[in-house]
């Protein structure tokens, strides 16, 4: 009986630990970005140690091609319930960096960039 109890506790502990370290729902996802309603680029989001980054992997803009491979989202962290904060997003064409909050809802990622008293919102679609 003691062996059964120890085995059960060990399995439960391993299961709980693996759930705690499960990847974020944004990890390894690809998103179509939009600017003023028009498709602009494609960003791949990855997670490492609880921190999300987003890299530009494609663009519809001829002048934006030079920015492919650029990390535009840095330091974003999950707050729970599909909400994210603490990161930054950079517009590589304007060379401006904004504080970032985001909200994941199904196949939509609503982002809001803040620069001083100003803010700008975009909704990206999961590819």
Please provide the spans of the model-predicted regions:
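Short, surface-exposed, charge-dense and proline/glycine-enriched linear segments
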Residues: 73-78, 116-122
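Central antiparallel beta-sheet cores of small beta-barrel/beta-sandwich binding domains
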Residues: 25-99
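Absolute protein N-terminus
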Residues: 1, 22-24
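Short, exposed beta-strand-loop hairpins at the edges of beta-sheets
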Residues: 92-121
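Bacterial N-terminal signal peptides that target proteins for export
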Residues: 1-10
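Short beta-strand-to-coil "C-cap" segments at the C-terminal boundary of structured domains/repeats
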Residues: 123-127
């Amino acid at each position: 009986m003691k062996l059964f109890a120890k085995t059960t506790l060990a399995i439960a502990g391993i299961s709980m630990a693996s759930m705690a370290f499960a990847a974020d729902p944004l990890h390894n996802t690809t998103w179509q970005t939009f600017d003023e309603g028009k498709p602009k680029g494609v960003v791949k989001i990855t997670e490492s140690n609880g921190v999300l980054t987003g890299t530009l992997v494609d663009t519809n803009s001829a002048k934006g091609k030079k920015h492919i491979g650029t990390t535009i989202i840095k330091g974003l962290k999950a707050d729970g319930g599909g909400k994210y904060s603490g990161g930054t997003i950079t517009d590589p064409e304007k060379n401006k960096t904004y504080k970032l909050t985001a909200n994941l809802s199904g196949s939509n990622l609503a982002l809001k960039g803040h620069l001083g008293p100003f803010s700008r919102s975009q909704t990206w679609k999961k590819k």
